[in-house]
């Protein structure tokens, strides 16, 4: 009998790792749980900073590195990468036999991990189900992961209600908030001078500032 439950998280890029960092830390600090991570996708690319090194520097065990990025901008390239990733995650999960698989949102590693867990009868915990991103494939992937998952950690009440409307049992759905806010709350605010230095142009206290963020269509 294992002393601790093994939670295997799968992360594919710095952005999802940052969002989940407080969750990983809480698991790591729990006396009855063990966290290991699979690094895949952009984490293993020099073009994106080879951020698997950041995961290790944070003190986490990287259970495996699953290469999945292929050069090319066409849709078939992304699907081929997904297929490669699926094979790699199968091998890792078969070797480790984790108690729970942990995924975030709507990316390739979310759907591949959820498929592996479903076919191998391993519970899947999904963070960020029920959210909406109209106009791209993310919505379909996220809802598909929801239907494959067993435990749902929604980031807001509306998303939790959407998960319930998809037919999930209420005792499996938890409205826990967005874990990405934990990192923001722990980050000291910058004054105008420091922000100006970071951005490379002058910002003055009290003057209006507009920030525009564009989410690419995937």
Cite the ranges covered by each PLM segment:
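Active-site and donor-binding regions of nucleotide-sugar-utilizing enzymes
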Residues: 6, 10-11, 18-28, 68-170
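Short, surface-exposed amphipathic charged segments that create phosphate/polyanion-binding patches used
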Residues: 52-53, 79-84, 187-193
């Amino acid at each position: 009998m294992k002393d601790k439950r093994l939670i295997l998280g799968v992360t594919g890029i710095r952005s999802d790792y940052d969002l989940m960092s407080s969750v990983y830390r809480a698991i790591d600090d729990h006396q009855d749980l063990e966290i290991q991570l699979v690094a895949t996708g952009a984490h293993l690319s020099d073009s994106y900073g080879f951020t698997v090194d950041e995961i290790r520097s944070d003190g986490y065990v990287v259970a495996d590195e699953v290469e999945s990025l292929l050069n090319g901008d066409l849709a078939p390239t992304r699907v081929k990468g997904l297929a490669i990733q699926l094979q790699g995650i199968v091998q890792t999960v078969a070797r480790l036999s984790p108690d729970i698989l942990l995924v975030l949102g709507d990316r390739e590693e979310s759907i591949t991990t959820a498929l592996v867990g479903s076919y191998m009868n391993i519970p899947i915990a999904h963070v960020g189900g029920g959210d909406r991103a109209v106009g791209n494939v993310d919505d379909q992937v996220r809802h598909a992961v929801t239907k494959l998952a067993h435990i749902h950690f929604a980031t807001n009440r509306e998303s939790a209600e959407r998960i319930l409307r998809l037919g999930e049992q209420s005792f499996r759905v938890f409205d826990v908030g967005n874990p990405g806010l934990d990192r923001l709350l722990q980050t000291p605010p910058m004054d105008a001078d420091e922000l100006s230095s970071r951005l490379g142009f002058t910002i003055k206290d009290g003057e209006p500032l507009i920030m525009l963020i564009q989410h690419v269509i995937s």
